[in-house]
Amino acid sequence: MKLKSLALLLMTIAMPAMAEQVSVSSKGISLILDVENGKPAQYLYFGSKLNAADLQNLTVATNGRMDAYPAYGLNTPAEAALAMRHSDGNLSTALVATGSDVKQEANATVTTIHLKDPVYNIKVDLKYRAYKDVDMIEAWTEINNGEKGTVTLTTFASAMLPIRRGDVWMSHLSGTWAAEAQLSHEKLQPGEFVIRNNDGVRNSHTDHAEVMFSLNGKGQENTGAVIGAALAYSGNYKLKTVTDDTEYHYFFAGINEQNSEYHLKKGETFKTPALALTYSNEGLSGASRNFDKWGRKYVLAHG
């Protein structure tokens, strides 16, 4: 009996940690992540809301980089959402999951994915707020320095989103004085597409920190699958889409880090601005209506 009990104990210890599907859902859209302790959190899905049966068939894509928040250090040719100089001068960072939790708010659910560096005392929380009555998910990041000295953040995106390659077009607004808000449609091609602002006070003058991705051809007003993204930030911003030799585009959004590295002292936490994400099968106007509802109810004073 003792030998049998010992064998069962050893079997239990040897079993690998099971990955957990973390579902972040509003009334009509879902963002699904694969979270396994000791491994990077990875994207599984973003789009129309899924049911329980759909969730069972999701697997992590193998023809792209699905890390939810890629850090600079282990795959240096790839674009990173986070890069830092540690207190000892090292530039390498790795982030693996340590768990997740969910908190209820009055009209939303906030999901937190906890990440940490296995070597350095750096903790990163990926935050997702899904509204119950509006098809909008806010994504932001909180970076905590537990090292003995100050670390320097050199890249600190709010979020990254992989988008499957195909006939994908990006719509955005640009302009100048007396000709603001000129709508442009750009087909995503290999390379990088960057929208950035360095002005500091007129950061909606020449461009806007918001884009829409039409997934099946040039953006149409009332038809087609569309991902919308808007950075809720009034300072210098950067939106960047990277298309490389994988089967995905990679969209990064956050504070423009150009000449703006941040010195994070021991014990301090840095919080990025939120990136608002939506999805619609009713074209550009469908995504726009989602932003309008969210903005009036939750962003604008007396909206």
Indicate residue ranges for each PLM-predicted region:
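Bacterial N-terminal signal peptides that target proteins for export
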Residues: 1-7
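N-terminal signal peptide c-region/cleavage motif recognized by signal peptidases
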Residues: 14-16
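An acidic-aromatic substrate-binding cleft motif
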Residues: 271, 287-303
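Short, Lys/Arg- and Gly-enriched loop/turn segments at beta-strand edges
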Residues: 278-289
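Short acidic, Pro/Gly- and aromatic-enriched capping/linker segments at domain boundaries
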Residues: 19-21, 245, 249-265
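Residue-level marker of beta-strand positions
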Residues: 269, 274-275
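Polysaccharide-binding surfaces and accessory modules of carbohydrate-active proteins
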Residues: 20-33, 39-242, 258
